[in-house]
């Protein structure tokens, strides 16, 4: 689910960043330099006379601002890999301010603009980019289940022109339920509200339902065809229930869930710490900025000649647990010590 870009008012602990070294690039540079020393002066001057244009990266998402955390993470990661904004790469950013219907035309516009690569966030943007082109490489982030959504053929062999970073929505479903019920042990019914157009949500629902049975919880999936159904579905939520809000493509859906959660004092768990800053109780899932940095490695490889179909889809490397202590206090919940010790971020 794409969200408004904003500075996150979170206190972070135990950050783990996974960096990919540049040893191969350094070796290649050294061999090139040695070869140039053996050429006559005129041959050495030719590369200086031919300036290659920067790679053009198209960005497609449903964010409310150009400076979304995944995009900022991508820029930082590319810089670490020797591809600097303005010198080696430029960005054509198309964000649709939460309007999913505007995403397909934006994808087609990027293809017509002849970008070298399209960087997407969330399933709707990734699917639109895939529908718009079979030749321009696509690198995605924040897609919960790329195989289940039909975006790639498999994790190891994506096929086609698409690869990227999975946010592991299916794999993390049971853990989110566990965290939610640890914070609110009296809960017996959990509403799983999702956007029906996010096809990758279905495998996650199965995992959540299986986990609910083990925990003796009633898991009630509620799919929305569009935002107009949201009020009706949220109207069924009662005090004593809880909400599991999976990652999706509609930020309006998440904001509405937070508002309903606060109004009824109903605990809700989210897929990223970003929503804790808006009043959500707890989140367990990938960090947006870190996913952008991780995706930078795939982007750099493709810009330097690799094919997307040869680059396996990666799982998000950094998973954060975040708790809004103010919301917990509002709900009358005592945050267990084991949650406090494991949490990577807090909102006070």
State where each predicted segment sits.
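Short hydrophobic alpha-helices and adjacent helix-cap/hinge residues
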Residues: 1-348
